[in-house]
Amino acid sequence: ALGFALDERAVATALTTQVHEHPVGVFRVRLSLAHSGAFKLAVAELDEPVCNWRVVIAEESLPANDYLRAHKTTVRGRCDAVLGQWAEDVFDAIFLNEQGEVCEGARSNVFIVRDGQWLTPSLKCGLLPGVMRRSLLESGRAVEQVLYREDLLSVEKIYLANALRGVIPVRF
């Protein structure tokens, strides 16, 4: 979609090598791909899970029509800066767009539970269509709906989700 070159065979070989070099434990792998097709892998042990995940609502809004938001990129200075403002006990910051609609967390997709129904913001609100989000939508466990700050503050439960950590219950 963004015109990047990719040698899938070379990436698969590099990933297989990493699996053999890290046979025991739980690791996260970050693949960084340059426009030219050059890539690098970074492997790190996954941190211990935190039992009491806390989130905040970011004061800064995100543009709903930023085409890069639909792709996992390294262009994340705004998200990193907002997360850097908070103490270590804050796992994520939830962003709204300029219309006041919930977008996403700086590192996760957002889900709320209202009347037993799992809801997640619509892609038109400007968010990354994450792997875990897609899985929950395709399974019928969640549905898309435009959500607002008031929804976050008045629901039964809030969850964040990403492919690395799965579905995580959170609190303000």
Model regions and ranges:
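Helix-start/capping segments and mature chain N-termini
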Residues: A1-R28, S32-F172
